[in-house]
Amino acid sequence: MTIILCGLPTSGKSSLGKALAKFLNLPFYDLDDLIVSNYSSALYSSSAEIYKAYGDQKFSECEARILETLPPEDALISLGGGTLMYEASYRAIQTRGALVFLSVELPLIYERLEKRGLPERLKEAMKTKPLSEILTERIDRMKEIADYIFPVDHVDHSSKSSLEQASQDLITLLKS
């Protein structure tokens, strides 16, 4: 089975994705890492730098292209926080496997974003809309298209045991 994780920035897509992939012995694909490995250069070494250089539309096209070219075998895929706002990216994964929305209450997202900083895509979007509206739109979209909603407010992403427990809980949800 292929499992695709979506969620807001800081929801734990990468940390839980790695733990779950290890638990299930599946290959793990982090879309942000794949963007870097496919589009980095001497000038751009992070997905944030690539986003700034390419702009939103071209960056989104890159995400969709990568999703379309992933190997067909079962895997665990972690999407970017805004990936599913673009129809081409959704089309690339919609029949690929189980889409799981990692839900986190907004106050906790705000707290984490304040500590970690805003991703470039959010900074760009905030030129035309307030952050609360952007995040609410993303939540609504992910809830609408996700096969499963998995609350992760309680998960400590720096704790191996917490990630292992969340992995087991998510597997139980997927089997239900």
UniProtKB/Swiss-Prot annotation:
Cofactor(s) demanded: Mg(2+)
Top-tier EC class: transferase
Associated pathway: Metabolic intermediate biosynthesis; chorismate biosynthesis; chorismate from D-erythrose 4-phosphate and phosphoenolpyruvate: step 5/7
Binding residues for Mg(2+): 14
Catalytic reaction(s) noted: shikimate + ATP = 3-phosphoshikimate + ADP + H(+)
Q: What is its EC number?
A: 2.7.1.71
Entry-linked InterPro entries: P-loop_NTPase, Shikimate/glucono_kinase, Shikimate_kinase/TSH1
Positions annotated to bind substrate:
32, 81, 138
Gene Ontology annotations for the cellular component aspect, listed alphabetically: cytosol
Note describing how the cofactor binds = Binds 1 Mg(2+) ion per subunit.
Q: Name one GO biological process term.
A: chorismate biosynthetic process
GO MF annotations in UniProt:
ATP binding; magnesium ion binding; shikimate kinase activity
Query: Which amino acids does the record list as binding ATP?
Result: 10-15
Q: Which domain of life is it from?
A: Bacteria
Family classification = Belongs to the shikimate kinase family.
Q: Briefly state the protein's biological role.
A: Catalyzes the specific phosphorylation of the 3-hydroxyl group of shikimic acid using ATP as a cosubstrate.
How it assembles, according to the record, is: Monomer.
NCBIfam families from the entry? PRK00625.1
UniProt protein name: Shikimate kinase
